Amino acid sequence: MNTQLRSDALAAPMPDARGRFGIFGGRYVPETLVPALDRLQAGVARHLHSAEFQAEFLLELKTWVGRPTALSHAPTLSKRWGAEVWLKREDLAHTGAHKINNAVGQVLLAKRLGAKRVIAETGAGQHGVASAAAAARLGMPCVVYMGAVDVERQAPNVGRMQLLGAKVVPVTSGDATLRAAIDEALRDWVSDPDGTYYCLGSAVGPHPYPYLVRELQAVIGREARAQMLELAGALPDAVIACVGGGSNAIGLFHPFLADSAVQLLGVEAGGRGAGLGDNAASLTFGTPGVLQGSYTLILQDAFGQVRETHSVSAGLDYSGVGPEHAYLMQSGRVAYESAMDGEALDALAECARFEGILTAIESAHAFFGARRYAATHPGARILIGCSGRGDKDMPILQRTLLKDLAAERR
């Protein structure tokens, strides 16, 4: 069955006309949002792949974002792991993460659709920073909704958003993390669907967002594929990325889907363990359901109530996942596993100590997954998506890794 599904995944255009990836995806929203989503879908169809839009988008990526981002060989990790390790360096993009690719594209689209303001949600703060920066660049007001828990643990990014001119609104309802921030942004959009553009930060939500975000982020994988052929002389044996909502992973994976010899591996937030509420691994532990406008895999109880999640990483601390990831797992084309908090922090410390790269805690989950993969695939050529830099995580690292280091030195 999996072999046939893999073939279908490569042959069939996704999503279909209803915004479905197999059984996942679609659009489950209040009637008040249907006209806004219809306008967005029409705008995407009209503009996204037009020569004019692509020329402006690619120029912004080149001259402002700093693309293409580097592909770096990791010689010490390669030696330690017994593999050939390469890093796709989205941490080197303007604002410090992959989120800027999507934000620039969507704010350009917002202007073409006649929106007067941009709103966004954020977890780790990187999408908020990217949206604020893109809005400032293109002359639009910006409001960012952020869970109160994340406001506290990602304070540096809150200040960055404010300096970039955005209004940051802490959300105290629900679990006060990313899911609550998305809910609040959707409420704002419902109140003013004509004048407001919702710049959704991940490949989640109702159609056409999962498709739109994937198309804007696929520049990551297109660059990485060409760079691997140029610098490594071959495609990777495995491509590994962290997965929360899944935008950096789908952007990296998508251009490799047709390369059947390349294994694709997503690494979720395993948190404290397998118990409900102890992790944010919806592909590993979730069940099908509707979350924030999309049918996907979500962490819910036996009564269908979405449960709170836990991860040391704010950017992965989400109770669902993009519907295309749910489909790719079901199809067998992409494998998914999880890394626990301590495992991710250990991988972060290893990368910093031996490669001189302070990666984001989100990306550190992928680094741990890559180390685990290398242990069973000696000599493998591995490409890791370094989705962002770890500067934003210093408050968390002060309480965890640096505290442990200080204790060791006493």
Predicted regions and their residues:
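Active-site/ligand-binding loops adjacent to catalytic centers
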Residues: 182-208, 212, 261, 266-357, ...
